[in-house]
Swiss-Prot record:
The gene is ptsH. PROSITE patterns: PTS_HPR_DOM, PTS_HPR_SER. PANTHER family: PHOSPHOCARRIER PROTEIN HPR, PHOSPHOCARRIER PROTEIN NPR. Residues 21-108 form the HPr domain. It comes from Chlamydia pneumoniae (Chlamydophila pneumoniae). One of its GO terms (cellular component) is cytoplasm. Belongs to the HPr family. The lineage of its organism: Bacteria, Pseudomonadati, Chlamydiota, Chlamydiia, Chlamydiales. This is Phosphocarrier protein HPr.
Length: 108
């Protein structure tokens, strides 16, 4: 995984609580790739979080709060997923998903 890139959205630069857009590439470590159980972990991780989150893999970008969308990515072991998070708490939320990828979503 790499360091996140940070973008302040132009229309929000002057607000006290800035909305950030952070991106980082995460590697799928699970032998079976992202299947139903890891997809469920991802969706639960984002449940209630004040963010927009997207995964990009193989040229497809999806809403990462949708289990069906995550499954349709078909990301295999070793797949590099670009994670994009837009939130006032983007750094904290990105760290949570990076930790989940690092642990193989609890399967390693």
């Amino acid at each position: 995984m790499n360091e996140p890139t940070r973008t302040y959205l132009e229309s929000e630069k002057d607000t006290q609580d800035q909305i950030e857009e952070l991106q980082a590439t995460c590697i799928v470590k699970n032998a079976a790739g992202i299947h139903v159980r890891p997809a469920g972990v991802i969706v639960r991780l984002f449940d209630g979080e004040p963010c927009d989150v997207h995964f990009t893999y193989a040229g497809k970008t999806i809403n990462a709060k949708s289990i069906m969308s995550i499954l349709m990515l078909g990301a295999p072991q070793g797949g590099e997923i670009l994670v994009t998070i837009r939130s006032k708490e983007a750094h904290r939320i990105l760290q949570k998903i990076q930790d989940a990828f690092s642990s193989g979503f609890g399967e390693l």
